[in-house]
Amino acid sequence: MLKDYLGISGTREDELRNSVMEVNQSQTIDGLTVTVRQAFGDAHTVYVLAEVRVPEGLPFEGKIDEVLVNTKLRDDGAVYNWLLVNKDEATKTQTYIIQLQTLKSILKKTIRIRFIDFRNVADYQNRNYFRGEFDFSFRISYKNIAVTKGLNFRTDKYTVKSVTLSPVTAIISFDAGTTDKDYDIDCRIITKDGSTPHVAWVNYIPEINPAIYINFDDVIDPDNVIGIVINGVEYLFTD
């Protein structure tokens, strides 16, 4: 399920599969059913798989209007996004992926996800065909298989403290006060086998604990990563 959408594969495939957390919480309002199936990730990034079953009377070409994600972490610098990734006409089921990133560890913490309204995107008036809120809360309890590499590399603009690698992200931490909010960051990772995992996007968060979050299209094997490249400069791990 979730592993299929994230592209889990590689030398640690079994370990990655086993770190998927089952949630299986479901709510139904007026025939519309939302189910939170699974969660997967590390201490700072969570992927959540949710399904929406659309009843007769609602347009299947519609979708959930809004997804809101909250944590109980203070000053966590959390960012999130969500995407409709699949529609099964035969079962009238839509699949959504929600991604949450936090500066503070989310392990053993509770996250809250709310699915709000259902609208027909094919309707030029963009009307809501269902109004209601599905409210879910669950504690993150999957196995954390991230590894951290110390670097302490200095440049004229910043000091790279460490890189934390997980199957879904690479988090590059800086010394506080050494980063520029407007600094343009271009990052990628270096692998043992020469492969170049495609970077989906890069989030640069200079506040609180300055860090770069590199998000990959597919799940990576942290053991296959031997270094990083920041703005054309290579940093190889020594351990």
List each language-model region with its residue ranges:
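Alpha-helical, hydrophobic structural elements that either
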Residues: 1-239
